[in-house]
């Protein structure tokens, strides 16, 4: 059963500017594994903006926005084929588990795309619905 959906779009230029103007921007919002992925992609602003939009989309699908957890509690990685995968930690994981009957049944689907100026992410939460947060 679909439990939640979320979408977010962001201007890549705003992310590029934040990276330039704030030396702590990446370390405040992204895990070490995410930053390692960005480095492997030559610190491509489109990739970073896509991950930022993905975190926002997942937070909206959880039904809370970025309340009750930090940006780092939603980790966006890629599998061996490049498909984005979501790992929920700490507060985000607790909120996700409150939504499903069986803690292991929550599945987070994610799609990320971008053009020259914007990045967009769409997330769907699926599982056996248990109740509200």
Swiss-Prot record:
For this UniProt entry, the molecular function terms from Gene Ontology, in alphabetical order, are: holo-[acyl-carrier-protein] synthase activity; magnesium ion binding
GO BP terms: namely: fatty acid biosynthetic process
The entry's Mg(2+)-binding residues are 8, 56
Q: Keyword annotations for this protein?
A: Cytoplasm, Fatty acid biosynthesis, Fatty acid metabolism, Lipid biosynthesis, Lipid metabolism, Magnesium, Metal-binding, Transferase
Record localization: Cytoplasm
E.C. number:
2.7.8.7
Which protein are we looking at? Holo-[acyl-carrier-protein] synthase
Output the lineage of the source organism: Bacteria, Bacillati, Bacillota, Clostridia, Eubacteriales
């Amino acid at each position: 059963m679909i439990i939640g959906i979320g979408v977010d779009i962001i201007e890549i230029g705003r992310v590029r500017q934040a990276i330039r103007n704030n030396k702590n921007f990446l370390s405040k919002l992204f895990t070490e594994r995410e930053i390692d992925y960005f480095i492997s992609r030559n610190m491509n602003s489109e990739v970073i903006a896509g991950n930022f939009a993905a975190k926002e989309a997942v937070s909206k699908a959880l039904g809370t926005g970025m309340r009750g957890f930090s940006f780092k509690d939603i980790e966006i990685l890629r599998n061996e084929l490049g498909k984005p995968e979501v790992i929920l930690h700490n507060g985000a994981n607790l909120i996700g588990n409150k939504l499903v009957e069986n803690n292991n049944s929550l599945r987070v689907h994610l799609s990320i795309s971008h053009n020259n100026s914007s990045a967009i992410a769409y997330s769907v939460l699926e599982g056996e619905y248990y109740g509200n947060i």
